[in-house]
Swiss-Prot record:
It comes from the Bacteria. It holds the Pfam family YpsA. Belongs to the UPF0398 family. SUPFAM superfamilies: MCP/YpsA-like. This is UPF0398 protein RBAM_020340. The lineage of its organism: Bacteria, Bacillati, Bacillota, Bacilli, Bacillales.
């Protein structure tokens, strides 16, 4: 696997409303654990759309991992121009910091938001252009990642496309591991 698409819950779907929420330590630890194993297997690119939450946390985690794995690259391909325009200032700043460090940045449709079709196009593009999907998602807790998952499941039926999940159980394990070592 060379290209990994990453998505998952938005912060509000997890009850996270501050960028210093303690839960982020565990979420990023779970993402890091998965990314390390993929890097060891040849991962070169992480593909995100720049969506708040899991995607930006994955990019931040990837940037931290660059100290050990300088060959790891991050591509941010947004579904449309200006997706961050209505976000609160701290979220915009986080987004801009992620973009500033990205190895590749592009807008898929080259237009501002027009319709939900742009999100469907983004999902289809990500699944087509990636070798696997990693998502922070638990089927017991439905949310926005389900649309990307549905697209990935369609592809999996035709060619065995790998889908990897970070579930609530994985997050509990990250908490327990952190507690064990502190």
């Amino acid at each position: 696997m060379k290209v990994l698409a990453v998505t998952g819950y938005k912060p509000f779907e997890l009850g996270i409303f501050k960028q210093d929420d303690q839960a982020l330590v565990y979420i990023k630890k779970a993402i890091e654990t998965r990314l390390r194993s993929f890097i060891d297997e040849g991962l070169e690119w992480i593909l995100i759309s720049g969506q708040l939450g899991t995607e930006l946390w994955a990019a931040e985690t990837a940037y931290d991992l660059r100290e050990e794995y300088p060959e790891l690259k991050v591509a941010v391909i947004t579904p449309f121009y200006g997706q961050e325009e209505k976000w609160k200032e701290p979220n915009k700043e986080m987004y801009e910091a992620v973009l500033a460090q990205a190895d590749y940045e592009e807008s898929l449709t080259h237009r501002p938001y027009e319709s939900p079709l742009q999100f469907r196009q983004k999902n289809a593009f990500f699944i087509e252009k990636s070798d696997a999907l990693l998502l922070l998602y638990d089927p017991e807790m439905e949310g926005s990642p389900k649309y990307m998952l549905q697209q990935a499941e369609k592809r999996r039926e035709t060619d065995g496309y790998p889908i990897y999940s970070i579930t609530m159980d994985d997050l509990r394990a990250a908490v327990e591991e952190e507690d064990f070592f502190t």
